[in-house]
Curated annotation (Swiss-Prot):
GO terms for molecular function: aspartic-type endopeptidase activity; peptidase activity; transferase activity. It holds the Pfam family Peptidase_A24. Residues 24-67, 125-127, 196-202 are cytoplasmic. The lineage of its organism: Bacteria, Pseudomonadati, Pseudomonadota, Gammaproteobacteria, Enterobacterales. The gene is gspO. GO terms for biological process: signal peptide processing. This is Prepilin leader peptidase/N-methyltransferase. It comes from Escherichia coli (strain K12).
Length: 225
């Protein structure tokens, strides 16, 4: 697919545009009830961007280039890029609002089950067990923290995102996903605290779950090739 590299780069730019527009449209803390999705797209064409707004663009273009160079079948390549766009959109929303909307997490979960049922990188049984275990593990952590500390350590959106990751990657990958997510979250908290010189009380965990799941999904695709 290297001959199609310019086309894939263009796809990366287009994907970034829609990732940001959908993230804005679905962001729960924004009052956009009077805006249609088309008006949101117009808003993003006219918006002036800060330097940090280029991060999703860089990631989208990098992911598109990786897909162009990957030796996978078109179905697997398309599925990987679709998963990436979903979790990137969720990460943008979570960083901004610390919320993960059901309108993205639940379709992502069902898409994972359907993909593995038809073209799967893993057995459908492993995908179903992964979805159940992904939700259940963080549900237990949530209530464990609540009983001990009397406060919420996680959000319900994190449960659903890990369930979706389990549906795509299987239950066997959940420990590694959680390890990567935990290390990423801890590292981010430490760096943020050093740079801002104040105590960080909460962080968005969704982006780190997204990172861990994307790494594991890419690895599964590679060993299945």
């Amino acid at each position: 697919m290297t001959m199609l590299l310019p086309l894939f780069i263009l796809v990366g730019f287009i994907a970034d545009y829609f990732v940001n527009a959908i993230a804005y449209h679905l962001s729960p803390l924004e009052d956009k009830t009077a805006l249609t999705f088309r008006q949101v797209l117009v808003h993003f064409r006219q918006k002036k961007y800060a330097w940090h707004d280029t991060v999703p663009l860089i990631l989208c273009v990098a992911a598109a280039i990786a897909c162009a160079l990957a030796p996978f079948t078109p179905i697997v390549t398309g599925a990987l890029f679709l998963y990436f766009c979903f979790v990137l959109t969720l990460s943008v929303i979570d960083f901004r609002t610390q919320l993960l909307p059901d309108k993205l997490t639940l379709p992502l979960l069902w898409l994972g089950l359907v993909f593995n049922a038809q073209y799967g990188l893993i057995d459908l049984h492993d995908a179903v067990y992964g979805a159940v275990a992904g939700y259940g593990v963080l549900w237990c952590v949530y209530w464990g923290v609540w009983l001990v500390c009397h406060k919420e350590g996680l959000g319900y959106g994190d449960f659903k995102l890990l369930a979706a990751a389990g549906a795509w990657c299987g239950w066997q990958t959940l420990p590694m996903i959680l390890l990567i997510a935990s290390l990423g979250g801890i590292g981010y908290a430490i760096v943020s605290q050093l740079l801002q010189r104040r105590t960080i009380t909460t962080i968005a965990f969704g982006p780190w779950l997204a990172l861990g799941s994307m790494i594991n999904l890419g690895y599964l695709a590679w060993i299945s090739y």
